[in-house]
Amino acid sequence: MILKALPNESMPREKLLQRGPQALTDAELLAIFLRTGTQGMNVIELADFLIQDFGSLRQLFSASEQEFCQHKGLGQAKYVQLQAVLEMTQRYLAETLKRGDALTSPEQTKLYLSSILRDRQREAFYILFLDNQHRVIKDEILFEGTLDAASVYPREVVKRALHHNAAALILAHNHPSGVAEPSQADRRITRRLIDALALVDIRILDHFVIGDGESVSFAERGWI
């Protein structure tokens, strides 16, 4: 179908303006980003083809430059645009989180941590350093690689927490396997960190394990 043949209210841009972005399908949202189709496909057909070819919208967004650019209708300019959009989204989430209380917006916290960690190919140990009002002072990745009791050093965590004058921490790490269920090693590491930080009156408020499309909160499980 030629895009111009669609009723005006069915055109992605007009539909968004009339009904809001939540009313659009993944393909329609992507079509707005792509702007133009290719020979033989209008922009919505191209968007739908790309989502099916990559497997999902998220897999398209997390593709490498080489994977992205080898697809019909895409190229380096679109890749750069997409990376800019994703970075702006991440910065928006970070700014929103840092302006509020990390505990009163747990879903926002999960969303932000997922955006940082979900698609990483290696395990990464991430910390939110909070003040006594539970506002974010600083966030950083402290360890990367295969995380176990030997590779996450409580002394280094304590050192960074004192450096930032933190009153509390929220921990997070990803499981590249995609399975968010915490391991026994995850629980042991968390307990060691709780004990080490208690010596300097710093609390761990939660530890999130980030998987593929899901996350597990230690606090919600009653483990903290």
From Swiss-Prot:
Biological process annotations from GO: proteolysis
UniProt-listed SUPFAM superfamilies: JAB1/MPN domain (SSF102712), RuvA domain 2-like (SSF47781)
InterPro entries in alphabetical order: MPN, RadC_JAB, RuvA_2-like, UPF0758, UPF0758_CS, UPF0758_N
Pfam families: RadC, UPF0758_N
Keyword Nuclease: no
Placement of sequence motif JAMM motif: 173-186
MPN domain: residues covered: 102-224
GO molecular function: metal ion binding; metallopeptidase activity
Family: Belongs to the UPF0758 family.
Protein's name in the database: UPF0758 protein VP0184
Species lineage: Bacteria, Pseudomonadati, Pseudomonadota, Gammaproteobacteria, Vibrionales
